[in-house]
Amino acid sequence: MTEQKYVVALDQGTTSSRAVVLDHDANIVSVSQREFTQIYPQAGWVEHDPMEIYATQSSTLVEALGKAGIRSDEVAAIGITNQRETTVVWNKETGKPVYNAIVWQCRRTATICEELKARGLESYIRDNTGLVLDPYFSGTKIKWILDNVEGAREQAEAGQLLFGTVDTWLVWKMTQGRVHVTDYTNASRTMLFNINTLQWDEKILAEFNIPLSMMPEVKKSSEVYGQTNIGGKGGTRIPIAGIAGDQQAALYGQMCVQAGQAKNTYGTGCFLLMNTGQEKVTSHNGLLTTLACGPRGEPAYALEGAVFMGGASIQWLRDELKLISDARDSEYFATKVDTSNGVYVVPAFTGLGAPYWDAYARGTIVGLTRGVNSNHIIRATLESIAYQTRDVLDAMQADSGIKLSALRVDGGAVANNFLMQFQADVLDTEVHRPKVTEVTALGAAYLAGLAVGFWDGLEELQGKAEIDRSFKPHHDEEKRQRRYKGWKRAVKCAQAWAVLHNEEE
């Protein structure tokens, strides 16, 4: 029998599908990435084509193995990590989606959320799912598809439709429709899963008019769910053995498996997660209570704060404002000026996430004077990412009663030294950047590898979490508080803007 030397992580993100191959020492051997189409049918709506998601993801698997000359029988397991909340509904007979995937960023269900609030469901949802009633989560997206796609409601009631977050869709496709499964971390993002009983919540399903028959089976994040022969020659079947939503996978990849450990991922959005172990901490500050992974991939509780616009605001500087030609240039221009010259950018393009939860907030730039130039605006945009992180971390520390000793960071924007130093200054906390910044893929690979015995336990992997650089806070306290006060004033200017605007039309 061929020696199994590798584990593959499939990282299905918001803008691209990636495959990352790791060896036994958790070194990255090969990476393949493909972008796919973003569909914007109207303002505030975001969709993906589920068939394109699957096509790009399966081709990256074949490509990553091919690039490194790895045969499929050398792969011990596949782990999947995915953009969370994004909703796919498909017909189990034809295998075809009844509608495009509705993406986590999509705000089309804001009115459904208002109706559900008016019916008094908010506190039940909060207490039992740990989430706030917001268009972000899958529940109202499924309801929208069933209510608006012709024939969908009838098919669902006849037991012909299946729902899945992206992990579920990929596993279903990769196993030729044999396995309909998700893990606790993804289930906890649907707004339909009871995090107290660890079961689908039948009361919420009934209120949303979603049949239980559509829901996948929920399993822990580290176990063999099924086998796939994608990328396999001669019928080799590779076990699919790990699943976790991208943020929980990153938390695991950063080795934050004990209560009180936290990380921030700077991707399209920013996601701060703190593991709270077996204790469910209820937030009084607009954070989410959600499920993460314990040391062996079993469900553990976590607090989460989501910032909708992190790296996406740098893309906006590049694509819409044309102030930079490459996202990496933002650091160079931001450091050409000493301060933002009193300017604050609040990138609330799709509303504000934690701790504000204002779907009607809109982006704003305040403090403009004649002396403000493009470098100040670039700097203020980067600073907004750090301020939003502080908003969330302050809330997290208040809820958990834990003062963070250091923040572990990952994601594309952590390569920006200016942003990382400013983050440490704003938080008055050390920021630790790991050597391997592919922590989301690492997390999925670890979960899969542990399930099949490729690694014995986390102790074996602890040494992999090396720190590349620590950023220590510099600012004096008075300056720190003054700047943060200015940020809070700027946020007030952005809040509830869309409501006011609609009244004027």
Curated annotation (Swiss-Prot):
GO function term, MF aspect, one: glycerol kinase activity
Transmembrane segment boundaries: none
EC nos: 2.7.1.30
Pathway(s) served: Polyol metabolism; glycerol degradation via glycerol kinase pathway; sn-glycerol 3-phosphate from glycerol: step 1/1
Pfam families tied to this protein: FGGY_C, FGGY_N
Binding locations of ATP: T14, T15, S16, T268, G311, Q315, G412
Annotated function: Key enzyme in the regulation of glycerol uptake and metabolism. Catalyzes the phosphorylation of glycerol to yield sn-glycerol 3-phosphate.
Name of this protein: Glycerol kinase
Protein species of origin: Vibrio cholerae serotype O1 (strain ATCC 39541 / Classical Ogawa 395 / O395)
Phylogenetic classification of the source organism: Bacteria, Pseudomonadati, Pseudomonadota, Gammaproteobacteria, Vibrionales
